[in-house]
């Protein structure tokens, strides 16, 4: 099976065999790319696999960028002769998940992550933190009801905003920085973004725990979740592939596997 997770910043492809993600490829999200270009990227990934009999028989897509969804559907139908499964809010009902929010529209990536979390951690009150372009804190009851949320900028937006709104500050990447105080401009900005993001997430988690006043099983996913590998004192479960795992679980439910 081919898994395609289309985000605002990156597109992540995954090859799944026997419910296991065996290969992934991440590229930047660029709406003007064609189905032919995506097929080239996929061939590069497939050529790295040490298997001669692998055939894509199913494709499932999560997308928050409609302009990229269209060429991905074309990729699926033209090159693989497959009508892909496109995740939408109706799939919440299939997975026995209730969206108990005033705004019922939920991003497909969020839904996939939540499907993954409630499947891996059943009968638990959950706080699922999706760390992508935006950072989304999802509260899910042990009865599988999505009842609360907090949405903040992601680390990438924080770094990008610094560059866009200042004339002289250098461009930086959001990477792990061992200490917060530096005597050079570049590292001072990197440390500010990294430790500022860590402090923001930790502070919001603490406030959520205070307001909820109950045990929450906390899971972090998304590209920026790896920034918290050394901060497991308040986020013990870090799973960058949780969204893709949720897509696999949904596929299995839809096709009775």
From Swiss-Prot:
Record carries keyword Transferase: yes
Cofactor dependence: NH4(+); K(+)
Superkingdom, natural source: Bacteria
Co-factor binding comment: A monovalent cation. Ammonium or potassium.
Binding annotation for substrate: 107-110
Binding site for ATP: 5-12, 133
Any one of the GO BP annotations: coenzyme A biosynthetic process
GO CC list: cytoplasm
EC number(s) reported in the record: 2.7.1.33
Keywords: ATP-binding, Coenzyme A biosynthesis, Cytoplasm, Kinase, Nucleotide-binding, Potassium, Transferase
Record flagged with keyword ATP-binding: yes
GO molecular function ontology, one term from the record: pantothenate kinase activity
Pathway: Cofactor biosynthesis; coenzyme A biosynthesis; CoA from (R)-pantothenate: step 1/5
Main localization category: cytoplasm
Catalytic activity: (R)-pantothenate + ATP = (R)-4'-phosphopantothenate + ADP + H(+)
One Pfam family named in its UniProt record: Pan_kinase
Assembly, per entry: Homodimer.
Family note: Belongs to the type III pantothenate kinase family.
Protein known as: Type III pantothenate kinase
């Amino acid at each position: 099976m081919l898994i395609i997770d289309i985000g605002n910043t990156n597109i992540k492809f995954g090859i799944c065999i026997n419910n296991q993600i065996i290969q992934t490829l991440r590229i930047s999200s660029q709406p003007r790319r064609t189905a032919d270009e995506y097929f080239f990227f996929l061939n590069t990934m497939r050529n790295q696999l040490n298997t001669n009999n692998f055939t894509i028989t199913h494709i499932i897509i999560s997308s928050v960028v409609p302009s990229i969804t269209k060429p991905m559907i074309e990729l699926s139908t033209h090159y693989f002769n497959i009508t892909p499964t496109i995740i939408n809010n109706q799939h919440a009902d299939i997975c026995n998940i209730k969206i108990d929010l005033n705004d019922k529209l939920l991003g497909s990536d969020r839904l996939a992550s939540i499907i993954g979390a409630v499947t891996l951690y059943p009968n638990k009150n959950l706080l699922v933190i999706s760390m992508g372009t935006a950072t989304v804190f999802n509260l899910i009851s042990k009865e599988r009801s999505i009842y609360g949320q907090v949405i903040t900028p992601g680390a990438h937006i924080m770094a990008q905003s610094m560059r866009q709104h200042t004339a002289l500050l250098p461009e930086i990447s959001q990477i792990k920085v061992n200490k917060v105080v530096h005597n050079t401009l570049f590292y001072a900005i990197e440390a500010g973004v990294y430790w500022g993001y860590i402090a923001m997430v930790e502070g919001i988690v603490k406030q959520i725990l205070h307001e909820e006043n109950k045990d929450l099983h906390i899971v972090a996913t998304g590209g920026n979740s790896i920034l918290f590998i050394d901060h497991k004192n308040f986020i013990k479960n870090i799973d960058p592939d949780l969204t893709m795992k949720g897509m696999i679980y949904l596929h299995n439910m839809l096709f009775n596997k």
